[in-house]
Amino acid sequence: MNSKIDSAIPFIGSLTALISGYSLHEWASLFGILFGAVSVWIAYRKYKEDVQARKDELAYKMLVAKIEAKKLGIAIDE
């Protein structure tokens, strides 16, 4: 037989034994940890997007204020 298949069969068997050895509460705790980590990652990405949106909005407001000040003849420090 192929040596790659021969070396993969024991690995697959040990992986199957490991998976079947877990009980329901162990699976629930593993999925809970996984879902918790994913939700923290999603919340962090959303937070970064919100911060960037606020920075962009502030930069736009500053630009509009400088344009209005220039129209009114007010000196601007750049």
From Swiss-Prot:
Main localization category? host cell
- Membrane-crossing segments per the record: 7-23, 30-46
Instruction: Record the organism.
Output: Haemophilus phage HP1 (strain HP1c1) (Bacteriophage HP1)
Query: What keywords is this UniProt entry annotated with?
Result: Cytolysis, Host cell inner membrane, Host cell lysis by virus, Host cell membrane, Host membrane, Membrane, Transmembrane, Transmembrane helix, Viral release from host cell
For this entry, the protein name equals Holin
- Gene for this chain: hol
Record function comment: Accumulates harmlessly in the cytoplasmic membrane until it reaches a critical concentration that triggers the formation of nanometer-scale pores (pinholes) causing host cell membrane depolarization and endolysin refolding and release into the periplasmic space. Once the pinholin has permeabilized the host cell membrane, the SAR-endolysin is released into the periplasm and breaks down the peptidoglycan layer. Determines the precise timing of host cell lysis.
Organism superkingdom: Viruses
Q: Where does it live in the cell?
A: Host cell inner membrane
Membrane topology (Periplasmic): 24-29
Q: Which residues lie on this side of the membrane: Cytoplasmic?
A: 1-6, 47-78
- Membrane-topology descriptor: Multi-pass membrane protein
Task: Give Gene Ontology CC terms.
Answer: host cell plasma membrane; membrane
